[in-house]
Amino acid sequence: MFSGRYGLGSKDTTPAQIIAVYKNNEKKTFTIGIYDDVTNLSLDAGKEIVTTPEGTICCKFWGLGADGTVGANKNSIKIIGDNTDMYAQAYFDYDSKKSGGVTMSHLRFGKKPIKSTYLVRQANFVACHNPAYIRKFNMSQELVDGGTFLLNCSWGTPEGLETHLPPQVKRFIHDHNIQFYTIDGVKIGIETGMGPTRINTILQSAFFKLANIIPEEEAIKFMKAAAQKTYGRKGQDVVDKNCAAIDAGAKNVVKVDVPDSWGKCEGEEYDIAVASGDRKDVVDFVNNIQAKVNGQEGNKVPVSVVSTYYEGSTPSGSAAFEKRGIAVNVPVWNSANCIQCTFCSYVCPHAAIRTMALTEEEAAKMPAGTVCLNLNGMPGYKFAIVVSSLDCTGCGSCANVCPGMKGNEALVMTRLEEGMAQPNEQEAFNTAVKFPIKKDVVAKFKETTVKGDQFTQ
C-alpha cells in the first residue's frame, strides 16, 4: 500500500508528477510537487511531458495586473468558443499583488476535448505584455520548436532588441526557430486614445492575427462586436477608441528577422534582486525566498528553506530589493520649476520618489549629474528629489499633485526608457536614501507638517 500527498501549497499537479507516482516502488509514503530535502519523501518528476490531444494550440500570456490582459483573454475564449467548432479552455494564474502584479493566462484550443487540468508548460504561442518581464522570467523557453513569441516593447528595432534582449532569449529564439514578433502597444494606446496602460484590445488583436485560429477579418469583426457589447453603456466614444485600437493592433505587428549572431550568444542575464546589508534576516529572506518567488521559481525552493519561516512571519523592508521596473511612465524632475513643497513624496504610495535634505559633503558624494538646489530656509543644506524608476508603478500621483512654479510642473511623466536614461538616476536614489535624517531640518519645518514629515523618511 502506497500513500502520497499532492497540491501542497496550492501547487500545480502535472502529468510528469503522476508518472513519477506510478514509477515509484521505493517510497511507501511520498509527496509530489515540492522539493522535500527534510524528510526526503518527495518524488522527482523529471522532464515535463505533453499529454494534450494532437492539434491542440496552447498559449500563454504574461500580463500586468489591471492592464486588461486577463479580461481580453476571457473575451478571446468566448469568441473562439462561440464562433468555431473548437473546444476551449482557460486557466488564470495571479501573484499576490493583484493590481500591478504578474498575471499569467493559460489558454488551450483544439478540435478534440481538452482534459488537461493543469497549467500550460509548453506553448505554441507566448506573449509578453510588459517589456520588464523579458529580463525577469524564463518565458521564451516555454515555447515549442517553431512556436510564436510576441513581445510588447518600445525598442523593437534591431538595435533596440540587440541591446535589451538577454543572451539566453536570443539564443533560444535562434536555436528553436521561434517566430518572433514585436509591437509597441503603449504607443498605439496613446495614439488611439486608450491610454498607455490599457493595451488589452491592442494585444488581443495582435494575437488573433498571429495565432491563425480564426481568419483575421472575422476575428476583428467579433472583437468589435464584443467591444460594443462590453463598453456600449459607456458611450460611443469609448467603443470607437476600442475599435481603433483593435484595427491598429493587427496592423502594427512587426516580424523580427532573427540574425545568425543570436545563435552564438553566451551566458545568461536576469534582473534578479540580490540583497546585501547589515540586516541578515532581510538578506537571507530576499536571496533565499523572495528573489525566487518573484522570478516565478518559487516551486523550486526546498522545504529546508521554507521551514525557516514556519511561523508565517517575514522581515519588513524586503520590498526595497524588488526593483521590478514595471512602470510605463515614470516622473522626471525639472528642478527649475520646483518650489520644494515635498507633496510628490508625500503622495507616492510606494516611496519611489524621495525629497532629500543633504549636507554639502553628502551632496558632493552624489553621482555625477545629480541636481542639488539650496534648501529654502536652511542655509548650508542642499535639496534634491530622487526617483527610483525601478520601484515606480507609474500611477502619476506625484505629477498630478505637483503645483510647480507659476503653473509649470516640476515633474513630468516620461516613458520608462527615457527616465532611466537620466544620468545616474537610479544610483542617485540608492545613494541618497542611505544618508541619515537631519534632525535640525525636521525641527525647522516641524514633523507635523508635510514638508517636515517628508524629511524624516
PLM regions with names:
Residues 7-53:
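A cross-taxonomic marker for long C-terminal extensions/tails that follow the last structured domain
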